């Protein structure tokens, strides 16, 4: 089974942007739902976070003093009280549905009531530069392992094990994939367009990377060349090393793109080279904020100082996100889009699990 990549949420549509509008590059919206049971300590904790591209814009935590959908970006704060009331009710319904689903899944896997278990989901959509759907997602996981996922065709499911196959058969009989596809091709796309327009000064900006190459001797015979990209947005970037024009991907150490803590990102790629041959190696960088690809070499006369503070901040943020990611892999309850102002999941749909229907795993989107 393919690896599921977590990320996503959704709201009520008040107006669609024209299909002719274009944006630089592709954009994405992801919602992540996580429910963690805690036997003997009350109801499961439910957390939802939503992202547009690399920017978190909404959050809900059932453990908050007054649980509500909370804005996490200035451009979503302009949504009115009714919007936030709908979001809050949606999350509260989802929390209750997940409570039932956790109990059902525990039965599927013949687990006792003593241990803590985690139900996670991710859903959302990607748009191309023309504002049209590139890819839709609806993925679920249980206890950190894949459970079931909507395939790229948005018409079929991939189940991870025999328990998930039971869910798959029920969903196929109920034509759940059609409901998911209608949402992903409809409301998901429309809301992402809306957010991109409302937050265009932030979401559609392109900040080029600050670049340099550092040299780190390993011995008398070898050294590490590290190519740095700092302070860039959006997060998508390409770093490669070449030796005499030949790609060195197999020998390159490449870290994941990391948040810098200020809304930008950082990344580096390193290669070990024979001492004295450093000038044969070039770092090649491509990013939306660059007018053209960059080619960099180590300059022995100007060894730059590595900005340790910025790196430490980025690592700290990465750790926080990693912890959150461990609490968020991909499992939830969502229902079909109802059009108009009801959103895409009704109270009745979210409570189906009480009657034993696996349709309730489909996530609530409004």
Swiss-Prot record:
Glycan-bearing residues: 110
UniProt KW keywords: Disulfide bond, Glycoprotein, Immunity, Membrane, MHC I, Signal, Transmembrane, Transmembrane helix
Pfam (any one): MHC_I
Listed InterPro entries: Ig-like_dom, Ig-like_dom_sf, Ig-like_fold, Ig_C1-set, MHC_class-I_related, MHC_I-like_Ag-recog, MHC_I-like_Ag-recog_sf, MHC_I/II-like_Ag-recog
Gene3D superfamilies hit by this protein: Immunoglobulins, MHC class I-like antigen recognition-like
Location, primary (coarse class): membrane
Location within or outside the cell: Membrane
TM helices/strands, residue ranges: 309-332
Residues covered by region (Connecting peptide): 299-308
Stretches assigned to the Cytoplasmic side: 333-366
Region Alpha-1, residue ranges: 25-114
GO biological process, one term: immune response
Region (Alpha-3): 207-298
Topological domains, Extracellular: 25-308
S-S pairs: 125-188, 227-283
PROSITE patterns (UniProt xref): IG_LIKE
UniProt membrane topology term: Single-pass type I membrane protein
Function, in words: Involved in the presentation of foreign antigens to the immune system.
Protein name: Class I histocompatibility antigen, Gogo-C*0203 alpha chain
Organism: Gorilla gorilla gorilla (Western lowland gorilla)
